[in-house]
Curated annotation (Swiss-Prot):
PANTHER family named in the record: ENGB-TYPE G DOMAIN-CONTAINING PROTEIN (PTHR11649:SF13), MSS1/TRME-RELATED GTP-BINDING PROTEIN (PTHR11649)
Protein's UniProt keywords contain Cell cycle: yes
UniProt-listed PROSITE patterns: G_ENGB
Organism (species): Alkalilimnicola ehrlichii (strain ATCC BAA-1101 / DSM 17681 / MLHE-1)
Annotated CDD domains: YihA_EngB
The name this protein goes by in its record: Probable GTP-binding protein EngB
GO molecular function terms listed in the Swiss-Prot or TrEMBL record: GTP binding; metal ion binding
Positions bound to GTP: 32-39, 59-63, 77-80, 144-147, 177-179
Chain ranges of the EngB-type G domain: 24-198
Binding annotation for Mg(2+): 39, 61
UniProt superkingdom: Bacteria
Any GO BP: division septum assembly
Length: 206
């Protein structure tokens, strides 16, 4: 566990790239379908209850939310996608903004794709995997809500997803995760450390 993530704070919500902070430093983006536990995962990784807003209404996150950790490193919460009740105009805007961000943001160092372990590899997940693979953006899959299964069953389901990832998207890494049980925090921090350059030494020096 790296406590440097606990100092993350909210900076801004941007509807598109033009209103994002300057394209510098390092960013890791969190993406995922609506209601997969993306906001809860960010809150757990930063040890904060409400840094990223959680809602029982899927599709509530409609803007790009930026959470700086240091002057040179930030987490980015991308809009939750794929919920039918989101207005069509909003969906069209998301469909434009997401590929623009992935392809055009120089600060982007990696994407954490959040999937519900109960319903992994949806059409949206596969689209994200294809996009990131085509653009060359490193991707780590966070299989959330592992607490809904017994430990052995969660591990087996994760390994099944891992086999599919290796077969279709070589190089993509994955792990199981539970926000409520704080399962997988150390492993996720290690991946973020690598992408953001925030190893233990960075945390001690600030």
């Amino acid at each position: 566990m790296n406590p440097i993530y606990f100092q993350a704070r909210f900076l801004t919500s941007a509807p598109d790239l033009r209103r994002m902070p300057p394209d510098q430093g390092r960013e890791v983006a969190f993406a995922g379908r609506s209601n997969v536990g993306k906001s809860s995962a960010i809150n757990t990784l930063t040890n904060q209850k409400s840094l990223a807003r959680t809602s029982k209404t899927p599709g509530r996150t409609q803007l790009i939310n930026v959470f700086p950790i240091t002057d040179e490193a930030a987490l980015v919460d991308l809009p939750g996608y794929g919920y039918a009740k989101v207005p069509a105009a909003v969906r069209r805007r998301w469909d434009q903004v997401l590929p623009e961000y992935l392809a055009g943001r120089r600060a982007l160092r990696g994407v954490v794709l959040v999937m519900d372990l109960r319903h992994p590899l949806t059409d949206f997940d596969r689209q994200m995997l294809d996009w990131c693979g085509h653009i060359g953006v490193p991707l780590h899959v966070l299989l959330t809500k592992a607490d809904k299964f017994k430990a052995g069953a969660a591990r087996n389901r994760g390994q099944n997803v891992g086999r599919q990832l290796r077969a279709e998207w070589p190089g993509v890494t994955w792990q199981i995760f539970s926000a409520s049980k704080r399962m997988g925090v150390d492993e996720a921090h290690a991946r973020l450390d690598e992408w953001l350059g925030l190893g233990p030494a960075a945390g001690e020096g600030r």
